[in-house]
UniProtKB/Swiss-Prot annotation:
Tissues of expression: Expressed by the skin glands.
Membrane-crossing segments per the record: none
Protein name per the record: Maximins 3/H9 type 1
Keyword annotations from UniProtKB, A to Z: Amidation, Amphibian defense peptide, Antibiotic, Antimicrobial, Cleavage on pair of basic residues, Cytolysis, Fungicide, Hemolysis, Secreted, Signal
Keyword Disulfide bond among record annotations: no
Length: 145
């Protein structure tokens, strides 16, 4: 009988020891996971701070550039280029969001002004395209003739 008790107690001690080792391994792995998550949070925090600093620097540089450009006198050529860029941006906006662009452009206009506005836009878009096509056809006709 004593032998059975010794074996049973030994078995209980061995299983308790195995469970404690298993629990230690789990707690170590959980601790490792928590440490990894914490280090990732720190890295993300640092990355976020760097990005916000870059955004602030870019905004400041853009504002400085804009204020420098706006406060100096522009030449007629620069003014014309800016007007063309603004027109191109409006045309691109109207292509992306035609309903909003037409609403924005037609606010406060009567029907005649609306018709004139759209014909001006068509001329502005079609004029350069037709000019290029006519130049290309003229060049082909000269080569053939």
């Amino acid at each position: 009988m004593n032998f059975k008790y010794i074996v049973a107690v030994s078995f209980l001690i061995a299983s308790a020891y195995a469970r404690s080792v298993q629990n230690d391994e789990q707690s170590l792995s959980q601790r490792d996971v928590l440490e990894e998550e914490e280090s990732l949070r720190e890295i993300r925090g640092i990355g976020g701070k760097i990005l916000s600093g870059l955004k602030t620097a870019l905004k400041g540089a853009a504002k400085e550039l804009a204020s420098t450009y706006l406060h100096r006198k522009r030449t007629a050529e620069e003014h014309e280029v800016m007007k063309r860029l603004e027109a191109v941006m409006r045309d691109l906006d109207s292509l992306d969001y035609p309903e909003e662009a037409s609403e924005r452009e037609t606010r406060g206009f009567n029907q005649d002004e609306i018709a004139n506005l759209f014909t001006k836009k068509e001329k502005r878009i079609l004029g350069p395209v037709l000019g290029l096509v006519s130049n290309a056809l003229g060049g082909l006709i000269k080569k053939i003739g």
